[in-house]
């Protein structure tokens, strides 16, 4: 299973590192995902959730 937020869909994105000489190298920017037990259809399930979604208070932990 890929590391993608179950609720918000946040996932790894790509960008560039830039040096002082403006040379570029590829880099990845990863979201802060935590594995959390939540109720889905009345059953507890472990899913990856972004901390932004957790802080919003819309997610009920089990």
Swiss-Prot record:
The regions listed as transmembrane in this protein's record are none
Question: In which residue ranges is the amino acid composition biased (Polar residues)?
Answer: 10-26
**Which residue ranges does the record annotate as region Disordered?**
1-28
GO biological process terms, alphabetically, are: translation
InterPro entries tied to this protein:
Bacterial_rp_bL28, Ribosomal_bL28, Ribosomal_bL28/bL31-like_sf, Ribosomal_bL28_bact-type, Ribosomal_bL28_sf
Q: Name one GO cellular component term.
A: ribonucleoprotein complex
Q: What protein am I looking at?
A: Large ribosomal subunit protein bL28
Organism for this UniProt entry: Enterococcus faecalis (strain ATCC 700802 / V583)
Source organism phylogeny: Bacteria, Bacillati, Bacillota, Bacilli, Lactobacillales
């Amino acid at each position: 299973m890929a590391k993608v937020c179950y609720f918000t869909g946040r996932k790894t994105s790509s960008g560039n590192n830039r040096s002082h000489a403006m040379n570029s190298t590829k880099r990845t920017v990863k979201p802060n995902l935590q594995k959390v037990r939540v109720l889905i259809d009345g059953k507890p399930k472990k899913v990856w959730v972004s901390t932004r979604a957790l802080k919003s208070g819309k997610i009920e932990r089990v």
